[in-house]
Structure formats: structure tokens, C-alpha cells
Amino acid sequence: MLQPKKTKFRKQFKGRIHGAAKGGTDLNFGSYGLKALEPERVTARQIEAARRAITREMKRQGRVWIRIFPDVPVTQKPTEVRMGSGKGSPEYWAARVHPGRVMFEIDGVAEDIAREALRLGAAKLPVRTRFIQRIVD
């Protein structure tokens, strides 16, 4: 699973996801992509599950690019622990996804396979998505 090699601080504020994505809204690598339509925090496990679903449907042909990276540590307190006494320990990593952000790109497969692969990948994610493709003039 994806996670940063090293961070300056162990814990981070929760934060909010306001507004549309500033960058990463266009296809840069592949011919087809999966674009987020709403703000959400996507965990490293969800990204990996989507990647596996996409790769399996493509039968390991073509190429997959993951355009988001989980760089936010999410903390949790153990179960049945009273409130107070500090913040919990970092449990997993998540990526903040803004609306309009391209999350996955694929290339080297036919459009129908790409559509189905990204549909299966989108089912693993907690965010509404849209299939996009490069416009060739």
C-alpha cells in the first residue's frame, strides 16, 4: 500500500476539503481516466483495492497510473477508551480528493475494456466518479 517514506510530523489536523481541485484535472499520461465528482478522503487500502480491480479487468495488458497519493495520517483512539488524554495514534493514510481530480489513468486497451475496468475500480472507492477520455482531433 502507498504511504510516505518520511514525514515532518506524525500527526496532522483533520482539515476540510473545500472547493474544486486546483490541479490534476486533465489526463496527462493515459487515454482514459477516472475523475472524482465530490470531495472525499480516500484511504490507501481503497486506492490499492481499486488498482487491483482495474489491473485484473485489463488482464495485465496496458498501463495504469495512480494520480493520487495518501499523504494524510488518520489517527484513531482504541475502542472503549474515554475521551480526552490526547490524540490517538496514526492508524492509516488517506488522500484528500477534491471534485474534478483525476484519480486513475489507463492506456493500451480498447475503450470498452477501459470503461469496464474503471467502473469496477470506481466501485471500490467512496466517491462518485466519471469516466473520461482524451479527445483526439
From Swiss-Prot:
N-terminal signal peptide = none
Of the GO CC terms on this record, one is: cytosolic large ribosomal subunit
Q: Please give the InterPro entries that the UniProt record associates with this protein.
A: Ribosomal_uL16, Ribosomal_uL16_bact-type, Ribosomal_uL16_CS, Ribosomal_uL16_dom, Ribosomal_uL16_sf
What Gene3D superfamilies does the record point to?
Answer: Ribosomal protein L10e/L16 (3.90.1170.10)
Annotated HAMAP family: Ribosomal_uL16
Gene name of this polypeptide: rplP
Q: Which UniProt keywords apply?
A: Ribonucleoprotein, Ribosomal protein, RNA-binding, rRNA-binding, tRNA-binding
GO BP terms: namely:
translation
**Family assignment from sequence similarity:** Belongs to the universal ribosomal protein uL16 family.
Q: Its quaternary structure? A: Part of the 50S ribosomal subunit.
Q: What is this protein called?
A: Large ribosomal subunit protein uL16
Function, in words: Binds 23S rRNA and is also seen to make contacts with the A and possibly P site tRNAs.
Statement: the UniProt record of this protein carries the keyword Ribosomal protein: yes
Any idea which GO molecular function terms this record carries? rRNA binding; structural constituent of ribosome; tRNA binding
